[in-house]
A protein has these predicted regions:
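Acidic, surface-exposed loops and disordered segments
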Residues: 1-96
Length: 96
């Protein structure tokens, strides 16, 4: 998921919202999806992940690379987290 960083100073947020919408749409279509973080990360050999993606895909430098999304058919269906195992003490409403 890319965004033109020359057009917006909030390109990271814009790309994150777009990626989230794609993840939700994939689920709605019965597909599985996984966010692969790129921005601010390095490859196993220490290279900048954003630049690696730019080089592999021919992405112009002005585009920021937020993430990759792997989308496909699910190998298995996971059950939602059991609510009694959730750490509700980490949830704050109206005040911290």
């Amino acid at each position: 998921v890319l965004a033109d960083s020359s057009l917006s100073d909030v390109w990271i947020e814009d790309a994150s919202v777009a990626a989230t919408c794609l993840l939700l749409q994939a689920e709605d279509l019965g597909l599985g999806a996984c966010w692969v973080q790129v921005r601010g990360r390095q490859t196993a050999d220490g290279k900048d992940s954003e630049q690696t993606v730019r080089d592999l895909l021919g992405v112009p430098q002005r585009y920021g690379v937020c993430c990759l999304l792997a989308i496909g058919h699910k190998g298995m269906e996971r059950k939602p987290q059991n609510e009694d195992r959730l750490k509700w003490e980490h949830l704050h409403t109206e005040r911290f």
